[in-house]
């Protein structure tokens, strides 16, 4: 065994001072001293349990001892009589075995392959033991779940990722998917439950047993987000539901995840074989599938952007040449050829890599370099995590942990270790780039005129600028020169290293050449230099623009077209990554795919890291907003589609925010107990105004109200029990907090909840019954007008149906025409006096006479006036489709409805484009005269003369 290095010998003295009397220094072996010096986790564990150290010294860890885990665990659980006891014993067993694994790993008593096997087998044994204990307990409580033939139904657990591949790292969360075979009901219990209820409750208890922190810690952090539909999907699915999902909706990334899926525990049963056979066609295609390369390239691009966004340059998993790239290389061959080559269907990386070499898909040399690099990186990763039992892949910056890793990896010092590490990662990167690297080859230095370089380097005399800037006016020439000079002065105030200077000197001549070719060069350059000032100290973003000429061209054209986009990019430079792929930049996410895209995006963020979750939500929104704006500018999205995309995006964000708030509240208080007998959450979010009407703009806030259906006597079922209605109030407050918290990426949305019953003076969240009562007995006419544009944007089916029924009932009430006309007209006049244009010779597109609000009031008046006779008028909440309904139901002439629709979309289109130019929503008085005259005539007809 290698002696401790000098820094570690010094640190040993600090360790000695912590040791209790039973662990006196003189009684410890050299091995014990080495491990205690290396790992604070082992040190803390044996201080709490000195008998573990005695056991380690007398019975050192063996390579094959994973075969005994099941028997050891069975003995540990033999006297467990309740769930609390189960949780305690599982946590202690996991910690005891992890100490043994850390000991073996630190001293290199066993191979790295053996360490990965032991870590994975330990997790599997703990998961299966917890499942089996809880299954018996739940059967005693509720009966045994059976199918229609009376056959008992088990809970099958798919271990995903490294757990499934038998390659779990030292401090890892576990990705699981729960499934049961067939529908049916429980038999033999005090009361009957259907199988879905049984397995959902059992699954919730299993997650709690494994995941909930106690004074003994936790067993594993459990991540269920890989299941169908993610967090918004059922916790447990039947085989039939799983099959339907993967056949009809399974995404490429879910296919990649399923490559490593492995059934935990006894995997030779009938149901296990059925599940495996069902999933295999989804994962391994019968034909050779080259579409995989582009899909994996896209995924790698997402990860590269994540590395840049979170500054993960020293990350041995996600960084260039890291563990993830080796996994991608192997998966390419599995997914392209695995359907035809059974040897490629292994879940584990190293056997698959051997099969790839045997099939001559990679050269023997490349395969061997990848194998050696993988084992080196995995050992380094596991050692790094075993220092503090901490889930990290980022190399340390402190001297102590660097000394620890250098010693444990058998190097003299840190530079020697990083030298070998760099060589391994370079080998991986080379193979990765040859196989699934970027489409574009490395960009060559373009032959730029020396004058552009001199212009940037400030060597041109004033007269010498004429050739390169000759097409610009004299004022623009002067402004361009001044902008370059000001930018260079700004650079002198900032700390930019040699690398940053070098990248800038390469980038700026290209940028100036492209910008100055434009007629609007001065305006465009002013917007781009403002952006560059914000990123000059972040060399990775400069490199992105320097190395990808296409990204630079997109940046220039977008900044020229829209100051809003320019300022967004300046505030949030991580959005620059979106410029890399024009296929996605000018092609927004499909309207029905925002939820799934967001779900995939959030999977990369730890579920329990609230700060990162908040950042990720905001960054996703900004990236999607950029795509929508880019498509709008390019003319590929008409105004109606712009609002559709902005609305679908907002709904996806609402869905994710409610999910996060719900998880946080349930973790703190448990669920309201009235939900035990029903599906759903008993909660709904209703969108009013532009959100309700599918008419969001780029900077629209969200008008929301919150409803629940919680009975007065309901309580939550957690350890910190609170009143059920108090739970929903806190849930709504949490949702508001998640929307409005300002992070480095800004806020998510401004949320206005004042349209709730009694406005700002009312409760933030209202019961469904109280909402209905208020609308029937207390609401003003303007509140009924608002209801015309309201719809549920998040909610379980029961509450959604209840709201829709109340809305329909209120809108179809008989109303006296003259009274309604007067009330609507007076409300509009009040608004115009309060909000109308204060600028002479200007037309406020939204608030002035003949503008958007007049059209909205006309449609709302006509729905409230005639829905009693024509209930179909209540179907839609957006103005365009309401105008269609008015024509279809013979309330309004078709010609008038179409003319109002054209006026409405024209005015809204102008508002969108003014927002892109960061201009207020008013225009010259002589604009849109025909549209305004048409709206005035319609207003006169319906709200004055009728």
From Swiss-Prot:
Pfam families, A to Z: GlnD_UR_UTase, GlnE
Catalytic activity: [glutamine synthetase]-O(4)-(5'-adenylyl)-L-tyrosine + phosphate = [glutamine synthetase]-L-tyrosine + ADP; [glutamine synthetase]-L-tyrosine + ATP = [glutamine synthetase]-O(4)-(5'-adenylyl)-L-tyrosine + diphosphate
Organism, scientific name: Escherichia coli O81 (strain ED1a)
GO molecular function: [glutamate-ammonia-ligase] adenylyltransferase activity; [glutamine synthetase]-adenylyl-L-tyrosine phosphorylase activity; ATP binding; magnesium ion binding
The protein's required cofactors: Mg(2+)
Residue segments, region Adenylyl removase: 1-440
EC category: transferase
Family: Belongs to the GlnE family.
Known function: Involved in the regulation of glutamine synthetase GlnA, a key enzyme in the process to assimilate ammonia. When cellular nitrogen levels are high, the C-terminal adenylyl transferase (AT) inactivates GlnA by covalent transfer of an adenylyl group from ATP to specific tyrosine residue of GlnA, thus reducing its activity. Conversely, when nitrogen levels are low, the N-terminal adenylyl removase (AR) activates GlnA by removing the adenylyl group by phosphorolysis, increasing its activity.
EC number from the UniProt entry: 2.7.7.89, 2.7.7.42
Renumbered residue ranges of the record's region Adenylyl transferase: 449-946
Protein name stated in the entry: Bifunctional glutamine synthetase adenylyltransferase/adenylyl-removing enzyme
Lineage: Bacteria, Pseudomonadati, Pseudomonadota, Gammaproteobacteria, Enterobacterales
């Amino acid at each position: 065994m290698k002696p401790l290095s000098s820094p570690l010998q010094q640190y040993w003295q600090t360790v000695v001072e912590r040791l209790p009397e039973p662990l006196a220094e003189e009684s410890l072996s050299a091995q014990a001293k080495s491990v205690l010096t290396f790992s604070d986790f082992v040190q803390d564990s044996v201080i709490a349990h000195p008998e573990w150290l005695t056991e380690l010294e007398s019975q050192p860890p063996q390579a094959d001892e994973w075969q005994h885990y099941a028997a050891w665990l069975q003995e540990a659980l033999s006297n467990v009589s309740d769930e609390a006891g189960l949780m305690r014993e599982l946590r202690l067993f996991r910690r005891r075995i992890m100490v043994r694994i850390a000991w073996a790993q630190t001293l290199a008593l066993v191979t790295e392959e053996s360490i990965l096997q032991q870590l994975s087998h330990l997790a599997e044994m703990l998961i299966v033991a917890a499942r089996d204990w809880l299954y018996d307990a739940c059967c005693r409580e509720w009966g045994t779940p059976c199918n229609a033939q009376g056959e008992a139904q088990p809970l099958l657990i798919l271990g995903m990722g490294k757990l499934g591949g038998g390659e779990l790292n030292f401090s890892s969360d576990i990705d699981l998917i729960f499934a049961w075979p067939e529908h049916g009901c429980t038999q033999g219990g005090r009361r009957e439950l259907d199988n879905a209820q049984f397995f959902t409750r059992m699954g919730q208890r299993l997650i709690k047993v494994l995941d909930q922190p106690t004074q003994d810690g936790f067993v594993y952090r459990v991540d269920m987000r890989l299941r169908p539909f993610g967090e918004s999907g059922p916790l447990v699915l039947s085989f039939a539901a799983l099959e339907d999902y993967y056949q009809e909706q399974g995404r490429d990334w879910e296919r990649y995840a399923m490559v490593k899926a492995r059934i935990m525990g006894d995997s030779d049963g009938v149901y296990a074989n059925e599940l495996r056979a069902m999933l295999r066609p989804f994962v391994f295609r019968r034909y050779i599938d080259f579409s995989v390369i582009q899909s994996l390239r896209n995924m790698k691009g997402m990860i590269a952007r994540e590395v840049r966004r979170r500054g993960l340059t020293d990350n041995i998993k996600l960084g260039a040449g890291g563990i993830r790239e080796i996994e991608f290389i192997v998966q390419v061959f599995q997914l392209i050829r695995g359907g035809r080559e059974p040897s490629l269907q292994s879940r584990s990386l190293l056997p698959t890599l051997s099969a790839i070499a045997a099939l001559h898909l990679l050269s023997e040399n490349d395969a061997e370099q990848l194998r050696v690099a993988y084992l080196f990186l995995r050992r380094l990763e596991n050692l790094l995590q075993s220092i503090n039992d901490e889930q990290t892949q980022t190399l340390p910056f402190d001297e102590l942990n660097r000394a620890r890793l250098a010693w444990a990896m058998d190097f003299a010092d840190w530079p020697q270790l990083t030298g070998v590490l760099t060589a391994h990662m370079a080998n991986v990167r080379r193979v990765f780039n040859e196989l699934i690297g970027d489409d574009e080859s490395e960009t060559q230095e373009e032959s730029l005129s020396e004058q552009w370089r001199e212009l940037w380097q400030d060597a041109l005399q004033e007269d010498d600028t004429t050739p390169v800037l000759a097409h610009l006016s004299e004022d623009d020439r002067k402004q361009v020169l001044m902008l370059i000079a000001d930018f260079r002065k700004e650079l002198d105030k900032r700390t930019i290293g040699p690398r940053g200077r070098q990248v800038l000197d390469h980038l700026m001549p290209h940028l100036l050449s492209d910008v100055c070719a434009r007629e609007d060069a001065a305006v465009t350059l002013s917007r781009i230099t403002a952006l560059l000032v914000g990123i000059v100290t972040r060399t990775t973003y400069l490199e992105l623009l320097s190395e990808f000429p296409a990204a630079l061209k997109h940046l220039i054209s977008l900044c020229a077209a829209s100051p809003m986009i320019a300022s967004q990019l300046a505030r949030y430079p991580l959005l620059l990554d979106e410029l890399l792929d024009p296929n996605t930049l000018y092609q927004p996410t499909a309207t029905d795919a925002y939820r799934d895209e967001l779900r995939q995006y959030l999977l990369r963020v730890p579920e329990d890291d609230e700060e990162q979750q908040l950042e990720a939500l905001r960054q996703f929104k900004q990236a999607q907003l950029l795509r929508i704006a880019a498509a709008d500018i390019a003319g590929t999205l008409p105004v109606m589609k712009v609002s559709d995309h902005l609305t679908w995006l907002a709904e996806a964000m609402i869905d994710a925010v409610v999910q996060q708030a719900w998880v946080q509240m349930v973790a703190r208080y448990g669920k309201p107990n009235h939900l035990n007998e029903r599906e759903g959450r008993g909660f709904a979010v209703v969108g009013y105004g532009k959100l309700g009407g599918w008419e969001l703009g780029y900077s629209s806030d969200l008008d929301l109200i919150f409803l629940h259906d919680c009975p007065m006597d309901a309580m939550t079922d957690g350890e910190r029990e609170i009143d059920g209605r108090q739970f929903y109030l806190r849930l709504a407050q949490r949702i508001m907090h998640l929307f409005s918290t300002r992070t480095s990426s800004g806020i998510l949305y401004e949320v206005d909840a004042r349209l709730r019953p009694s406005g700002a003076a009312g409760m933030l969240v209202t019961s469904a019954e109280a909402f209905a009562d208020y609308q029937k007995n207390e609401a003003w006419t303007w509140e009924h007008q608002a209801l015309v544009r309201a719809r549920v944007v998040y909610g379980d089916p029961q509450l959604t149906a209840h709201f829709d029924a109340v809305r329909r009932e209120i809108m179809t009430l008989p109303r006296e025409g003259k009274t309604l006309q007067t009330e609507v007209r007076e409300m509009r006049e009040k608004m115009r006096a309060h909000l109308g244009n204060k600028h002479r010779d200007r037309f406020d597109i939204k608030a002035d006479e003949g503008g958007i609000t007049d059209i909205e009031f006309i449609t709302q008046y006509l729905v409230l006036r005639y829905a009693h006779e024509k209930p179909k008028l209540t179907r839609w909440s957006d103005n365009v489709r309401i105008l269609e309904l008015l024509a279809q139901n013979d309330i309004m002439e078709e010609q008038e409805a179409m003319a109002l629709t054209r006026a409405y979309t024209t005015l809204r289109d102008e508002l969108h484009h003014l927002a892109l130019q960061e201009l207020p929503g008013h225009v010259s008085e002589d604009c849109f005269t025909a549209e305004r005259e048409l709206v005035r005539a319609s207003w006169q007809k319906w709200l004055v003369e009728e």
